[in-house]
Structure formats: C-alpha cells, structure tokens
C-alpha cells in the first residue's frame, strides 16, 4: 500500500529529520506533483537503525544524487540502498570552480583562507565592505546558474530515473534550492516553492533553537542560516532568475535546454 503524504509533510525516520517528498504541490494548470517520485533529504549516514534502513529501502529509489562535497561524503558516506544508483555532484562551488567543502575540516580550512578570499573578492566587485550575510546571500543567488549538480538533477528528471532522492548534509541549502527549481519547472508557484523551502525551519526547529539559545538576540536572524534557512536568501536565489530572464520558462530553456516541448513532457510525466 502506498503511503500518501500531504505537500511538504516530513517522512519520519528515527535518526534523521527534514526528509520529505515534493508530491502534492499544485501547479498553475491545476494538476499536482505526483507522489512517490521526488524525495529530498539530508545526511543519510544518520540512518542507523534497521527500521530506518527498511523505510529508506521501501521508497524504491532508483537514483541517489549526493550534493555534498567529497570531504563531507567521505566523512559521512551514504549507506548502500538496494536498487539505487549513487552519484555525487557538489552543489556549491567556489569562484574558481572547486568544491565548497562543508565537512568539519573543510569548514576550518574555508574559515581560515578560502571563505575570506572569496568574501574579499566579492567586496572588491561591489566596491565596499559587506556583512557575511550579504556575501553568503550573493553566493545563494549564483546557485541556480551553471551549477553542475542541478544539471545532473534535471538530467535524472528528464531521463525519468525515478524515484530519486537528492540530498546534502542538512537538506536545507543545496537541497532546498534544487527543490525550488524542480517545483518552478513543474509550474508550481513561487509562493509554494518558498513554502517548501522554509519548512526546513519547522523540521529542524529543535536543532535551530539549541544553536541560537546562547546567541545575542540581535544576531539570531543573521545566524539562522547556519542551522536553518532564511527566506530572503531563498527568495533571492529564485528572484535572481527573473532578474536575468523574462520568465522561469526562459531560464529553464537556456540553463537546462528545456524548451517548450521538453518542459511540457517533464510536466506531463511528473504532474497528475
């Protein structure tokens, strides 16, 4: 018996949170995204129990797309899932094209050198000092463009290699932007795409609250994206599309080669 979830509902696991599917969201033409095909999540290494492994296997996954860096994946490797093909394509990259590594050691290295250099380069481009939040928002706005991870994701969708699970470490940033792009491609509204994006703060509420508990109140909004997501950052990423293109359809045609015929075929397959 297939279990049907309401749009954005969390799929419960003992060891992980923020695991859900994209089924149920309504597109502009009145159809809804099909259930049981498009899954999003975080670190699968957190699924330790037999019950969690059985639950994951029950999804019948054909593809797992890991959006993490090599360092993150090596530190917390995905478990083998029967019948699922695994590939890894990092979802965030530095200006020079190298992977942005959010593993423990990677973050330490980034803090010391790479992130500082990236931020300084951004400040030179805008001609003034910027706050970390503004700089990271700028990184977010670049994520939908020329991103090999999202090209791999849409190739799986067009190839109908589903059910597919795409995930990163927390299921919020690289995964969240990817999920919004899928929903927009299927004709779901910007508002509903952002609703799905912001649900991370619901399913990671306890983690976020623990992290922010000892932080100054004036800094909590700025620090929220460390463990949660920021609506201005998520909105900024997809609104940047309309700043560069006259429509989402024009973006999908130029970025992924999804002309009108291919976009219609994608929607006909994933909507009902």
Protein language model regions, located:
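Cys-dependent protein tyrosine phosphatase-like superfamily
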Residues: 1-165, 177-272
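Ser/Thr-glycine-rich phosphate-binding loops at phosphate-binding pockets of nucleotides
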Residues: 170, 174-175
């Amino acid at each position: 018996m297939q279990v049907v979830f309401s749009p954005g509902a969390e799929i419960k696991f003992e060891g992980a949170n923020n695991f859900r599917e994209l089924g149920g969201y309504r597109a502009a033409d009145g159809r809804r995204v099909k259930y049981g095909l498009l899954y999003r999540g975080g670190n699968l290494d957190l699924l330790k129990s037999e019950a969690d492994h059985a639950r994951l296997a029950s999804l019948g996954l054909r593809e797992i797309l890991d959006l993490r860096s090599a360092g993150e994946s090596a530190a917390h490797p995905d478990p083998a899932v029967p019948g699922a093909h695994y590939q890894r394509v990092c979802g965030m990259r530095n200006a020079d094209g190298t992977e942005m590594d959010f593993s423990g050691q990677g973050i330490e290295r980034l803090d010391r050198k790479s992130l500082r250099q990236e931020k300084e380069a951004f400040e030179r481009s805008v001609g003034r000092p910027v706050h970390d939040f503004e700089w990271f928002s700028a990184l977010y706005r670049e994520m939908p463009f020329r991103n090999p991870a999202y090209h791999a994701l849409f190739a799986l969708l067009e190839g109908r290699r589903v059910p597919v699970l795409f995930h990163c470490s927390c299921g919020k940033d690289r995964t969240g932007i990817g999920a919004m792009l899928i929903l927009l491609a299927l004709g779901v509204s910007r508002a509903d795409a952002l609703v799905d994006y912001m649900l991370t703060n619901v399913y990671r509420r306890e983690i976020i609250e623990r992290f922010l508990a000892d932080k100054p109140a004036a800094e909590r909004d700025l620090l929220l994206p460390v463990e949660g997501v920021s609506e201005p950052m998520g909105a900024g990423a997809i609104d940047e599309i309309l700043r560069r293109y006259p429509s989402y359809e024009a973006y999908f045609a130029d970025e992924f080669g999804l002309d009108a015929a291919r976009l219609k075929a994608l929607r006909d397959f994933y909507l009902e």
